[in-house]
Amino acid sequence: LDLARDVQIAYADLVFARAQKQIAAENARLRQEVAAIAAARLRSGDISELEESASRLEALRAQEAAVGFVQGAEISRARFNTLLGIDVQDTSFALTPASEMELPQRTLPELFNAAFASRPDLRAAELAIEAAGKRIGWERAKILAFNGVLDVNGAGKEGFEIGPGAQIEIPLFNWNNGKVARAQAQMEQAARQYLVVKHRLALEVQETYTDYFAAQQALTLCRSEWVPTATTAASQAQKAYAAGDVSYLFVLEINRQLLDARVREAEATANLRRATARLQHSIGFYQAEREN
């Protein structure tokens, strides 16, 4: 379960790193054009040396960032390969970015139930209760009944309390006091651990559920508002330049803003992929449930 989540997150990181590398290269090219225009304007006396130096430094920073993103993409590929169990330098297979997966619409209580039914760590806690029940001589029906009513009420007068179901007494028979105390302690420990795991799973589902919908909304906003607006502005700037209404420098600046929008979209996409992987992990199922 953890490996499936980690592979999906590594895939999201790799796709994002590649997008960053491509966009950074385009940004470096734009900055170089701006620097070249600034140098020409300096020669014609339109700007000062300080302004030209600022443009040149921006171009150098963009080139440095592009190199860094190339290295980052290589590291992301190595991490992804490692999780798949193949050589870190193996690039013989190509990755085609898939569209973002939309999970079935489920309410939070439904996700809680899915997690409680599927998570192996909660099942392990249930098995610990079964083992403790067998040690004190309970039949399976009584163990299942105990699991059914087990709940947390906080600290009561008697310390640990089971939930608001029927009282279940531990049959002690002719055991001595030492065995009685040990059986009581083992059952209480197993029950407490079960509740701890169940509460932790509920919190994990709640957090990942919230993160998933926040990431989904952020990507929707980016694709419906940010990128279309920047794309339209770039197209209008190009037409205005062709008509002689604006300078080429203005067109380059608008195109740089479009690159910023594309970075935001790539980041939002990666965040949604990561959030999806974590939500799937929290509820304990993957492809089989989606196909159903």
Residues covered by each model-derived region:
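Periplasmic alpha-helical coiled-coil/stalk elements that build and connect Gram-negative outer-membrane
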Residues: 2-114, 208-211, 215, 219, ...
